[in-house]
């Protein structure tokens, strides 16, 4: 019985977190891009592809929109450049893992 209560509490927390995260993700520029034509959606940047020149153009994943994650790369000449790729942030990976686990348990 205790395990069921823990799983239910975890799922309620996840659902409330994801709904608040969805509201936070809808910034003004993203809202405008969502209201634009659907060609924008077809031209979004897939997961693991470079988004250095278009940091708000990442596609949506299963539950969340991918985020443009940037790192600084130092070449052998000592030059520093910023390289970015679309990926799933760690907190979104954790949420997807919990949801997947919940689906396996509750079918």
Curated annotation (Swiss-Prot):
It is found in: Secreted. Disulfide bonds join 44-59, 51-68, 58-86, 70-84. Belongs to the neurotoxin 19 (CSTX) family. 04 (U1-Lctx) subfamily. It holds the Pfam family Toxin_35. Residues 21-41 form a propeptide. One of its GO terms (molecular function) is toxin activity. It comes from the Eukaryota. Keywords: Disulfide bond, Knottin, Secreted, Signal, Toxin. GO terms for cellular component: extracellular region. The keyword Transmembrane does not apply. Expressed by the venom gland. Its main location: secreted. Residues 1-20 form the signal peptide. The presence of a 'disulfide through disulfide knot' structurally defines this protein as a knottin. It comes from Lycosa singoriensis. This is U1-lycotoxin-Ls1k.
